[in-house]
Amino acid sequence: MSGIFYPGKLQASDTVGGCIDIFKNVWPNPEETIQMTELACSDPESGISWERATTTDRGVHQTKRTNYHLGISNAAEQGVSTAQNIQNQMYMLLLAAVGPYVEKYGVTGGLWHEPYSMLRYRGGQEYTSHYDGGTETARSVSAIVYLNDSYEGGHLEFTNFGVKIKPEPGMLVLFPSNYAYRHIAHPVTSGTKYAIVTWIRDRQL
């Protein structure tokens, strides 16, 4: 993939709900990313495939999510070139965006990236109301990159703030992982939604 452009620091295009920062058009090749990923997944020899998304942390959210995921970081470690390209691009993007974000909001601690995953939602799949992590998880900042908008539904809603975001191709959303930022990935009623997600921890576990 080409077209990475992350010199210096990225500033948010918009801020809503206190600490929800939206960066528009910061993933330069979203459609190409989807095409390359699906092409790799269609090859049984590629070493990369979609799996049912699971929540292993506390188990309490597993019944709330019905989407599929692709372990980008794990596949990259296994030498899958498509995953390595996505991994590198995501890392560069977060270097440019997360630093200014934590400075802006006075977030303390380290910046430890959890493995990156690509998510796929279709046919009514959703992730109902949840938050990404309490203090025991060390999750400080949540990051979502949206790759397309060729679907119906699939909005991101922060229930405590009355904020609903319509994903756009190449959009990055950063927000606190704590309970105040409980959110919903609404059902995709038509088409397929793709996103890349990770969480930034303030310490190693």
Please name every model-derived segment.
Residues E103-Y105, H130-Y131, Y181-H183:
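Eukaryotic intrinsically disordered and solvent-exposed regulatory patches
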Residues M118-G123, T135-E152, I200:
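Short, conserved beta-strand element in jelly-roll/cupin
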